[in-house]
Amino acid sequence: MSDDAPAVPGLFTLVLHTHLPWLAHHGRWPVGEEWLYQSWSASYLPLLRVLRTLAAEGRSHLLTLGMTPVVTAQLDDPYCLTGMHSWLANWQLRALEAATLRTSSDTTPACTPEALRAFGARELREAEHALDEFATLWRHGGSPLLRELVDARTVELLGGPLAHPFQPLLNPRLREFALREGLADARQRFAHTPRGIWAPECAYAPGMEDDYAAAGVGHFMVDGPSLHGDTALGRPVGDSGVVAFGRDLQVSYRVWSPKSGYPGHAAYRDFYTHDHVTGLKPARVTGRNVPSSAKAPYDPDRADAAVDAHVADFVQVVRRRLIDESERIGRPAHVVAAFDTELFGHWWYEGPEWLARVLRALPEAGVRVGTLTDAVDDGFVGDPVDLPRSSWGSGKDWQVWAGDQVADFVQLNAEVVDTALSTVDKALTQHASVGTPTPRDTVADQILRETLLTVSSDWPFMVSKDSAADYARYRAHLHAHATREIADALGAGRREQAQRLADGWNRADSLFGALDARRLPR
């Protein structure tokens, strides 16, 4: 802490939510595996690098990191690891092409040969470092690296249900199964069972806290409006003892706001402007209304200065918020800023560097930084509260996942889940023998696996936001078809055909290998 920055009351927690849908084996570009590899290279590699560096400096309790089972499965999958290595090698080749470019028909300022050569040289160094780092550290997947950070208490890990379903609309049996299997998946990968979860889409329905308590979950995230904006303390929900933490919108929107958030600053790398020869992003934002054809070349020194300015601004915002909220409630307050992990690096190129600097700067400015578990253990918990049905989507309700635009998804999901549960129940009953354990049924396992992929919250979100909506509809109906196809064969007594179908679908959808239909609540 510097001499001119006295300690402020309370605790600040940064929460990052890491999630992508299952993309392996389901398309390459523009939506599919390319989405995974871009996020991995731009966000996950830099974030782990930042956290490992800060841990080596002796820092701990830095942030709370949500890792959904479906994204962790891809970070550990041999197919994805091989694909990521190839993607990084291709990035290196594209950077080399830019660094040696002599002529170009593109006359935009950021894509002239001179500008691209300078940009390409920097990009080449970055790609070479990323490829070397990946080959050295990631050869066994992401879980060993994350486990090191959890064991060192660098981060707190949040878990979540398998495949990221919108829980309020899910059949209670499948909802319980998805959550318990998701926590078991984390335990298997990290030798650690998370005390808290990031509820998919921060979605909540009254009574879900009891399900959480029964599964051993002690705390979860909601959006600020779910607590009517009073997020200064965690709040037990009803008499469950499970604590809901609300995202502080005033602090979070300082970073993550389409109109005034840091990533839109003129100095930062522009996400949308590409060099069409190499696919690289050589321009800076330049201005909010500046077309891509007029954007200026990226200037790392200018961006670096902007990062420093935004670190200083954020630190002051957090200090002021902690002081104000502590005065308002008459006791030390807790401020939670929560973001998608992919914001840092993928959407906002400079985001990982901003994170590294802000996590150093906050303690120096007299701000205590800790995790959600720290907040519970240290008493940053207020009186019990009843929560409304809510989410962090548009309108803070369920409309993104249950509105008219996606009503067909709601019906599809209900039908597929009913089919899956009835088929699995029948199959397990037929296999059961008095006095002997029921054998594992990989056909029933695959039915549930495909069902969970069908009900992923990503598909209706993408349709509601008109973001790769055709791909989202294709994926939902593909997994629904897989569920029905296997279930129909099994229900008709064609066990061998059902096994062949299950094995075939498993070649594309082999995630959650420990998923066991025998643990489905009866």
Predicted regions and their residues:
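Active-site and substrate-binding clefts of carbohydrate-active enzymes
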Residues: 4-63, 67-125, 231-522
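Acidic (Asp/Glu)-rich catalytic clusters
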Residues: 5-8, 52-59, 141-158, 187-190, ...
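Active-site-proximal, well-structured secondary-structure segments within enzyme catalytic domains
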Residues: 101-143, 148-168
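Glycine-rich phosphate-binding "P-loop"
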Residues: 159-181, 185
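CE4/NodB-like, metal-dependent polysaccharide N-deacetylase domain
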Residues: 175-199, 317-338
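Conserved short loop/turn motifs at secondary-structure junctions
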Residues: 194-204, 340-344, 468
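Hydrophobic, small-residue-rich alpha-helical packing segments that form membrane-like cores
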Residues: 203, 208-217
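His/Asp/Glu-enriched short active-site or ligand-binding loop at hydrolase and phosphoryl-transfer sites
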Residues: 218-229, 368-371
